[in-house]
Amino acid sequence: MSEHSKSIEIYGQCVDDFEVSPFESVDMLHRRSTLEKAIQELNYEERMKLLSYDMQLIKNAKNMAKHIGEIYDFSLSEEPLSQWWWHLDKVANGNISFHLSPELESDVAI
């Protein structure tokens, strides 16, 4: 299992976990940012798994924002909106919307 795959799996275990401390959940957000920086290094399966976990976090946005909000003020986040996980409060209240758009891989012939 690659280092990225391990990190994706750990992230996936965290998106539904409200039993851990909010500090550990903030670590999940940092982990997701690290994965975003390496997104071009991920293979297709890793990207799909990451997308699946992202969708679960979006589904849990309200509860996770409340959980993390015990120690983190989302309104002070300076992260770009492209890193929406740092803005779960806005995701939860519908101020950030998502659109699925296809991308053609560079080595695929049309």
Predicted regions and their residues:
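Long, contiguous secondary-structure blocks with strong helical propensity
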Residues: E24-E36, L100-L104
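Amphipathic alpha-helical binding modules
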Residues: I68-I110
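Acidic, low-complexity, intrinsically disordered interaction modules
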Residues: M28, E36-E79, Q83-W85
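N-terminal, helix-rich and Lys/Arg-enriched segments in bacterial and organellar proteins
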Residues: I8, G12, R32, N43, ...
